[in-house]
Amino acid sequence: MLIEVDLPADFPPPRVPREPIARNLRDIIPAGKGRVDKAEYLARLRRGQRAGMRSLLTLMNTEHSHDWRRPTVVCIVGGGPSLAEEVGALRHLIKRGEKVLAVNKSHDWLLQPGLRCDYAALLDPKEWVADYIDLDLAAAKSTRKRAGKFWAPPKYLIASQCHDLVLEKFKHRKEAYMWHAAAGLGESEILKTEFADELWVNIAGASVIGLRAVGLAHGLGFREMHLFGIDGSMKPAADDSSPKLYAYDKPHIDKTWKAFEVKLTSGWRRAFMANHHMARSVYEFEDSMRDWDRQIKAGKMEPFSLRVHGNPDYSAIAMVAAGMGVHAAAEENETYGKAPPKT
């Protein structure tokens, strides 16, 4: 897949000229190390480890099924605009008894109408993330019976890189668990030497929590994953609305808008609009898919399946997923897996 970028771009609507500048998005928006520098990242790692929360390691493989014919299933729910159109598919999986891992404000989006939420994960280091989760929502629905299934309050998976306000909010809660976002900055060496007698776990992956959650889910033991609201792009404006980067309101939105074009190896190409970190997530999704495949083939990772839900017309990750044959809709995989019709 080649991702081409046209800079600068008008907004709205997304625009790519007839002859776009063929520059790989990796060169324009390089892989990030997060929103804090190395010194602050490692300082937060130490503070997080000392916060007193239980380690996520104590939950590892708790969702593992010993029946290979029936792998445990999880729905990873992000906040992309396609989420609003995929509620029916999500409800179907929940009704079937499948579990849900929410990221960021999706926790509240799920609980407000009474949908299931078993896990909620946070990673972003900014202070406003402390307001992403309303703990009163979970408390008001401590045990619910939905679709014949009993389910318990969410478990909160908090990255050590989160802001101190986030740690303060969760550090005394028995249902909160600490993990570290691996970034290749020497964090493993620090944990091994300074916290040798303590439990800890590093989770590698993409820079956005929606994709890093795949590693979290795999560590918990899930072997079939459905991604909802993981788009990497915005939904263009309809006649009576504004463009949408999220399915719900967020108080802080990065408005570094870029127009970019995704070109699949099958020949399909389409323009999308996103901000920096969302655009980065598109190529991180492709890179992650290839990395997981290499690790599985090398015997370093247990096999798992992944399905992406979303409309490829405006969801860049859904389009890439369809081109790689992992879209939840078989017809989308068939469409984007072959050359587009000639016009």
Name what the model sees in each region.
Residues 1-343:
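Metal-ion/cofactor- or nucleotide/acyl-coenzyme-handling active-site neighborhoods
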